[in-house]
Curated annotation (Swiss-Prot):
Bias kind Polar residues: ranges: 615-625
Domain HTH myb-type: 262-327
Protein name (database record): Cyclin-D-binding Myb-like transcription factor 1
Region (Disordered): 34-71, 95-119, 568-645
Biological role stated in the UniProt entry: Transcriptional activator which activates the CDKN2A/ARF locus in response to Ras-Raf signaling, thereby promoting p53/TP53-dependent growth arrest. Binds to the consensus sequence 5'-CCCG[GT]ATGT-3'.
Stretches that traverse the bilayer: none
Domain Myb-like: residue ranges: 219-257, 333-382
Species of origin: Danio rerio (Zebrafish)
Length: 645
């Protein structure tokens, strides 16, 4: 693959295969062969070029006898020698949508056995203790509970508990209980939904308020609101509920905003005098000496008051993220530190990142500026996995270990995280759901080379001989994920691999168990005069929907790829006619131009855009003017539009 100066233009010269296989666990594995000229259909190429890691709840457990869910992490490095394609693929755990209430009870710990775990759980999650004395009493009795950020598992459990509570009482909206009912009417609500959560009732109460109070998600404060907030603060003091009601915001929101608001705050770069003053105040209030590491036990409100020119948030951030590290002689953070951080967290063998003691982890690490800074560094690393919020923590760690250990020359990595439920029957919806993001790339070879491709039903070879065909059946549709440009490739009737290879030199994408259907889209591309096919693109790709004019009245969702019309294939025979295409003249045939008879067939190709994608304009195909629509320049579509004009 030769890449020009413009990164969006890629010229592919060689022929390579992309092989999808499916193991016994239902995991999709993508094989990336090297450009070494080996026969892609030979047995030697079946040796996997990836490494797989299986994770299960109990090692050695028979998967057929287990009701647990198993996860696999598959990583595929793209090396310098493998220039055939670029692929980014991720997969998340998918569960059956229809679960019986008994199954929900088992998974959420609502059954009687879960409630009998011990008095330590009930003592914490069933008590309204808010004072230090109450907490000390429970600690002295040996009780422990979780603090800090809520994990995905905790939030899922809380939401399930709320849904069950509402279902049992015939209530539709939880806001009726939280904001409208009296304390007497909702007295058992918080104790019921806190079951299985090792957190105090007050923590559950605060979490629920933040989740369901719409006033907590209003947005950034305007200058007018700031001025009004100052007036209300002078009038009502610390009556946050009254202030929040007057502003249309939650009490916690106005409290946090007032805490960070200060009229005398400077902005921008800190001066040397401000840094010196901050260091003096911190060491004075904590009783430490210059050069000592101070990360805990600091009243930042008091620090800000004595510094005078910065808010407590500014003081805290400046000290923990820079000044403390600078004065103690710290070193710079490197790529090796990224690897060590993931390794050290994995060695802790914790089930959730909230169990990590960042003070201990940061201790003695010269390049760590503070425990808080180290935690933010971890957040930056884990965001490299787009669906990190949906993955169990051990699975996320396994994937991240391969990502951070990649050398600079192999920055492009393919991370596949698959899962299956051992006893779950295949669901028509969740049989195979994989979020996939694959840039379109085309190779161009002679027909003889293309006919020599392997007949393996799980291998796809993009060969362009005299004609190249892509067939997309209506049984496929794309379900958007939370990540822009990434979608679920979803099949409806089978769990087998949804891609097969046709026997001819053309390429067909079809569902293995789906019958042939006349409602399909066939996109044809002619051979070019040159030996190379140039594809202009950027990441991520696009979805092309083809519909007839009578269907344009119905809105088309971005989440579904449907074929409503067949684009007619051009044949070299002069005697063959087609009602959808006017017979071209001899001169037009030499130029490869075609004219559509708009009175017979009216079709529209809808380009569903995604961030960063584009397609060259037909008016000036050689210029830099582009439309933010697609990624693929198709000769047929260009000639059709030129003929129509």
């Amino acid at each position: 693959m030769n890449t020009g100066d413009v990164p969006a233009t890629v010229t592919l010269e060689s022929v390579n295969s992309v092989t999808f296989t499916q193991d016994t666990d239902g995991n999709i594995i993508l094989h990336c062969p090297q450009n070494d000229g080996e026969d892609l259909g030979s047995d030697e190429t079946t040796e996997p070029v990836h490494k797989r890691i299986r994770l299960s709840s109990e090692d050695g457990e028979d998967p057929q006898d287990s009701a647990s869910t198993e996860y696999s992490v598959v990583t595929l490095p793209i090396t310098d020698g493998d220039e055939s394609f670029e692929v980014t693929m991720t997969a998340t755990e998918m569960r059956d949508e229809e679960l019986e209430s008994d199954d929900l009870s088992e998974t959420t710990g609502k059954d009687s056995s879960a409630q009998k775990k011990g008095e330590d759980v009930s003592a914490v999650s069933q008590a309204w203790f808010t004072t230090k004395e109450d907490k000390d009493t429970l600690v002295n009795k040996g009780h422990k509970w979780k603090q800090g950020m809520w994990s995905k598992e905790e939030i899922d459990l809380l939401m399930t508990n709320i849904e069950l509570y509402l279902k049992n009482r015939g209530i539709q909206d939880p806001a009726e209980i939280i904001f409208e009912m009296s304390k007497e009417e909702r007295k058992d609500f918080y104790r019921s939904i806190a079951c299985g959560l090792n957190r105090p009732l007050f923590a559950v109460y605060r979490r629920v308020l933040r989740m369901y109070d719409n006033r907590n998600h209003v947005g950034k404060y305007t200058d007018e609101e700031i001025n009004k907030l100052k007036e209300l603060r002078q009038k009502h003091g610390n009556d946050w509920a009254t202030i929040g009601s007057a502003l249309g915001r939650s009490a916690s929101s106005v409290k946090d905003r007032c805490r960070l608001m200060k009229d005398t705050c400077n902005t921008g770069k800190w001066t040397e005098e401000e840094e010196r003053r901050l260091a003096e105040v911190v060491h004075e209030l904590t009783g430490t000496e210059a050069g000592d590491v101070v990360t805990q036990g600091v009243s930042w409100a008091s620090v800000a008051e004595l510094v005078g020119t910065r808010s407590e948030k500014q003081c805290r951030s400046k000290w923990l993220n820079y000044l403390n590290w600078k004065q103690s002689g710290g070193t710079e953070w490197t790529k090796e530190d990224d690897i060590n951080l993931v390794r050290r967290i994995a060695e802790l063998e914790v089930e959730d990142e909230n169990e990590i003691n960042w003070d201990i982890l940061a201790s003695g690490w010269s390049s760590v500026r503070s425990p808080q800074w180290l935690r933010s560094k971890w957040w930056t690393i884990k965001r490299q996995v787009a669906n990190h919020k949906e993955l169990p923590f051990p699975v996320l760690l396994k994937g991240l270990q391969d990502v951070v250990e990649a050398p600079p020359s192999t920055m492009n990595k393919v991370v596949v995280v698959g899962s299956r439920s051992a006893n779950a029957s295949p669901s028509p919806v969740t049989a195979l759901q994989i979020p996939v993001q694959i840039p379109v790339q085309i190779t161009h070879v002679s027909s003889s080379d293309g006919s020599s491709g392997t007949s393996d039903s799980e291998t796809i070879t993009l060969n362009s001989g005299a004609l190249q065909t892509f067939e997309l059946l209506p049984s496929f549709h794309l379900q958007p994920t939370g990540t822009p440009g990434t979608y679920f490739l979803q099949t409806g009737t089978n769990q087998s691999l949804p891609l097969t290879l046709s026997a001819n030199p053309t390429v067909t994408l079809t569902a293995a168990a789906s019958p042939s259907s006349p409602d399909q889209i066939i996109l044809h591309s002619l051979t070019t005069d040159t030996e190379n096919v140039t594809v202009q693109m950027s990441h991520p790709g696009i979805i092309i929907q083809t519909v007839t004019s009578e269907d344009l009245a119905d809105p088309l969702g971005q989440s579904e790829l449907e074929g409503e019309q067949v684009l007619v294939k051009e044949e070299p025979s002069e005697n063959q006619t087609n009602p959808a295409i006017e017979e071209p003249s001899e001169e037009q045939s030499k130029q490869g131009e075609k004219t559509l008879d708009s009175s017979k067939v009216v079709e529209t190709v809808l380009m569903v855009p995604s961030p960063g994608s584009f397609i060259p304009t037909n008016e000036d195909i050689s210029s830099d003017s582009v439309l933010p629509l697609g990624t693929l320049t198709d000769p047929i579509l260009e000639n059709q539009e030129e003929g129509s004009n």
